[in-house]
């Protein structure tokens, strides 16, 4: 037994040395020139959640609530169904406030509402609701919580869409957020022209999911095509394409390429880097951080709480990060600080961390 133990120990040591040698040979370093991240960063892509506890009006579909994803989402939000039932949906935002207060790099975040789907006649489609987080709930809650801003969500098919845009602006909305794939929004629909012109009038940018979506039980990924954004861009809406369209394809071309093709033609088209360090999207990091068409167009966001999943880990970048960087990032408890450190170490430049605040006109 002693000889066997010694043999295993030597095998482990030999394997470890071989791995270190191979890592030394194949180590590539950051995707772009790495530099220390700045402090005072704004996360412009942060979700909250709820299912109506405390009279919030929020809802999730029965299919999603029965899914394994539901309990996982609550866990990575840092709460539970029992706690939300006891304290109300607003507890999710309270958890966010506490985490932001403890962050070294993040000063504030934009909390996103999520409107329900509406049909072409302007009627709410109850059986297609995946997740609904009302504007009134988010807009009022953030007024009393330090470090939180209001990201509205207004479906353009609503009969009161223009009035809802005005209410949102009057109540502090920073921008409008869409997830077309589950809300049933075709951005290219000509009947939305007045809606887009109202957004321009109110100086409300649009943060919209672009690319495929797989976090919900029902989705129409044809609505995530970047090319559908041409109409609002032509109307003058400033658009932030979430995730740089880093998932899916249309007509045999990856969505990210379809988005990049549009960048030279529309100076009002931007993108955020949320979820780019997820295992299923990280293959695009080199392209995103080095493509000239994205220079000055990228801004920082997390898609919180997805930064709290195993899909976002420094351990997946052994040939890009030093061992010291990996250990430091893995041992960082605050999810926002962990995300900032990871993206900075991989080569995300200072101006990306700073653009979200300057673009949205928010003082630090």
Which stretches of residues belong to each language-model region?
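N-terminal Sec-pathway targeting helices
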Residues: 1-16
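An N-terminally biased module of ancient metal coordination in phosphate/nucleic-acid-related enzymes
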Residues: 12, 19-112, 118-129, 337-340, ...
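H/E-rich (His + Asp/Glu) clusters that bind or coordinate divalent metals
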Residues: 24-30, 245-364
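Hydrophobic faces of well-ordered beta-strands that scaffold small-molecule active sites
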Residues: 42-46, 109-111, 149-152, 176-178, ...
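Active-site environment of divalent metal-dependent phosphoester hydrolases
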Residues: 47-52, 116-119, 156-160, 183, ...
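Short, flexible/disordered intra-domain loops and linkers
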Residues: 58-60, 77-86, 118-130, 215-223, ...
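Short, acidic/polar
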Residues: 92-100, 157-167, 256
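Active-site gating/metal-coordination segments in enzymes
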Residues: 108, 113-221
């Amino acid at each position: 037994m002693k000889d066997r133990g010694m043999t295993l120990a030597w095998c482990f040591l030999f394997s470890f040395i071989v791995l270190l040698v191979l890592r030394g040979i194949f180590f590539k370093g950051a995707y772009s020139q790495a530099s220390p991240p700045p402090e005072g960063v704004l996360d412009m892509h942060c979700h909250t959640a709820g299912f109506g506890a405390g009279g919030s009006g929020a809802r999730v579909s029965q299919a999603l609530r029965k899914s394994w994803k539901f309990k996982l989402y609550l866990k990575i939000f840092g709460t539970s169904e029992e706690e939300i039932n006891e304290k109300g949906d607003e507890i999710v935002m309270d958890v966010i406030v506490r985490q932001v207060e403890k962050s070294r790099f993040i000063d504030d975040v934009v909390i996103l509402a999520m409107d329900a789907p509406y049909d072409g006649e302007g009627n709410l489609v109850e059986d297609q609701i995946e997740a609904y987080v009302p504007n009134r709930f988010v807009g009022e809650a953030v007024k009393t919580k330090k470090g939180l801003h209001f990201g509205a969500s207004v479906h353009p098919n609503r009969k009161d869409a223009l009035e809802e845009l005005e209410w949102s602006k009057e109540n502090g909305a920073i921008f409008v957020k869409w997830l077309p794939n589950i809300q049933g929004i075709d951005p290219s629909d000509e009947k939305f022209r007045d809606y887009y012109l109202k957004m321009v009038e109110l100086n409300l940018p649009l943060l919209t999911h672009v690319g495929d979506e797989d976090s919900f039980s029902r989705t129409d990924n044809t609505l995530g095509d970047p090319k559908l954004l041409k109409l609002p861009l032509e109307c003058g809406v400033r658009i932030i394409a979430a995730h740089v369209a880093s998932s899916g394809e249309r007509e045999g071309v990856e969505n990210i390429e379809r988005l990049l093709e549009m960048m030279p033609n529309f100076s009002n088209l931007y993108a955020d880097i949320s979820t780019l360090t997820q295992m299923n999207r990280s293959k695009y990091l080199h392209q995103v951080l080095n493509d000239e068409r994205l220079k000055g167009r990228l801004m920082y966001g997390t898609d919180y709480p997805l930064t709290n999943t195993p899909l976002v880990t420094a351990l997946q970048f052994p040939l890009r990060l030093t061992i010291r960087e990996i250990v430091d990032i893995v041992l960082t408890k605050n999810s926002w600080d962990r995300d900032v450190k990871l993206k900075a170490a991989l080569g995300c430049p200072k101006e990306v961390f700073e653009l979200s605040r300057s673009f949205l006109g928010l003082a630090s």
